[in-house]
């Protein structure tokens, strides 16, 4: 019988960080990854904050950092823009495949076993308790499900699927004119319903461009955007993926099972980014899995400490970003254009820049709260979004 102390399903960042944490605590851990090469297929936009990497205990490495980002420019549907420029490096454009391999090396270095080309066909469940995985069956005291946005294992175990599923696509474009250290975010329901389009500079006139949407074909939408933004350009083959903006699932543990990362919906609802917040949660999952093995108690009653931990650390962040996402999703393109006009007309661009520059790319509740407390910004938001929508957002900070 194939048996180990813990199994992690999925060798993306969440799975690798969970495994690194388990191995550091001296507990056996085996990572099972369905694809033959870690980091492939790569369907991530590849933009990570400096502070986020620090939170995960990852030093920026030339092996995966492609370019430094200091700020961004946000565009309205009509093409008006607000610049959020900073004087320091705020984020890195990364090679996601190289980043994942970097994490895999760290997990192996801590003592984890990584097995690629291992397709999992389901969970081994007996008397309501997860005991391992099917497909060349393997048994473990605790299974960490970090399989990604599809979430099939969690659903098999009876947990709800993550909400806010969007189709995303990325391509790389060269020979274009872009600001070398400024990300572009393009809003609009006609362009990208449910999220936005993005341009991430990579240096030397190249950029990673992408789009995510809740309806229609994402690649067709992206091609129209590229033509609008750059004219006739050549681009790399598209890389498609799933993006989640609906917030975490309500329960992330069962007897013998922990769910982390995209599989648990632990992504930023505002942007769909999941590496940092999902990684923070995954480290908590690894810690709890190791403690469950040490205590010889993989019961739900013991493992629920994982959910308590990540909710205490990030619950307000997820809730505030989800409320902000729902508010933005209600806005028509015309309303967004009016908001941009009002920000410029009332001279609030500098104030908005200051809030965002002083804020945190991943822990966004501080920026949201500061905007709601500023009379000028609040007045514009009320006129643009409506009192009811903003009241729902403010209620998060006044329980």
Model-derived segments and spans:
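Beta1/beta-strand and adjacent pyrophosphate-binding region of the FAD-binding site
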Residues: 1-14
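Conserved hydrophobic helix-helix packing surfaces used for dimerization/oligomerization
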Residues: 6-8, 29, 257
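Predominantly flavin-linked oxidoreductase catalytic cores and closely associated redox partners
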Residues: 11, 25, 101, 106-236, ...
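Glycine-rich FAD pyrophosphate-binding loop
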Residues: 20-43
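Conserved N-terminal glycine-rich FAD pyrophosphate-binding loop of Rossmann-like flavoproteins
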Residues: 35-59
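A conserved beta-strand/loop capping segment in the N-terminal third of enzymes
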Residues: 50-102
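FAD/FMN-dependent oxidoreductases across multiple families
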Residues: 214-294, 300-301
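C-terminal helical "tail/cap" subdomain of flavin- and related membrane-associated enzymes
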Residues: 290-399
């Amino acid at each position: 019988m194939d048996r180990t102390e813990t199994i992690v399903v999925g060798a993306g960042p969440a799975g690798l960080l969970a495994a690194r944490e388990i191995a550091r605590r001296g507990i056996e851990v085996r990572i099972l990854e369905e694809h033959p090469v870690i980091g492939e297929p790569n369907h991530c936009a590849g933009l990570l904050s400096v502070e986020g990497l620090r939170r995960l205990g990852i030093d920026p490495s030339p092996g995966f950092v492609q370019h430094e980002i200091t700020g961004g420019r946000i565009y309205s549907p009509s093409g008006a823009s607000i610049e959020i420029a900073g004087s320091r490096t705020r984020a890195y454009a990364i090679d996601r495949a190289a980043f994942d391999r970097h994490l895999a090396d760290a997990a192996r270095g801590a003592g984890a076993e990584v097995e690629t080309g291992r397709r999992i066909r389901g969970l081994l469940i007996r008397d309501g308790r997860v005991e391992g995985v099917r497909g060349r069956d393997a048994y473990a005291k605790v299974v960490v499900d970090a399989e990604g946005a599809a979430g099939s294992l969690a659903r098999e175990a009876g947990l709800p699927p993550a909400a806010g599923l969007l189709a995303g696509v990325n391509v790389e474009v060269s020979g274009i004119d872009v600001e070398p250290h400024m990300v572009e975010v393009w809003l609009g329901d006609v362009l990208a319903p449910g999220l936005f389009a993005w341009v991430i500079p990579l240096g030397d006139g190249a950029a990673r461009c992408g789009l995510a949407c809740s309806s229609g074909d994402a690649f067709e939408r992206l091609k129209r955007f590229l033509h609008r933004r750059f004219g006739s350009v050549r681009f790399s083959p598209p890389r498609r993926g799933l993006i989640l903006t609906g917030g975490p699932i309500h329960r992330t543990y069962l007897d013998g099972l922990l769910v982390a990362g995209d599989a648990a919906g632990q992504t930023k609802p505002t942007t769909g980014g999941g590496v940092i917040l999902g990684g923070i949660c995954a480290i908590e999952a690894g810690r709890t899995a190791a403690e469950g093995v040490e205590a010889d108690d993989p019961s739900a009653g013991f493992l629920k400490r994982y959910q308590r931990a990540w909710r205490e650390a990030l619950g307000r962040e997820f809730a505030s970003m989800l409320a902000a996402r729902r508010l933005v999703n209600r806005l028509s393109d015309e309303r967004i254009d009016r908001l941009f006009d009002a920000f410029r007309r009332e001279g609030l661009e500098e104030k908005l820049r200051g809030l965002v520059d002083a804020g945190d790319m991943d822990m966004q509740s501080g920026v949201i709260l500061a905007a709601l407390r500023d009379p000028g910004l609040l007045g514009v938001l009320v006129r643009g979004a409506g009192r009811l929508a903003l009241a729902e957002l403010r209620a998060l900070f006044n329980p």
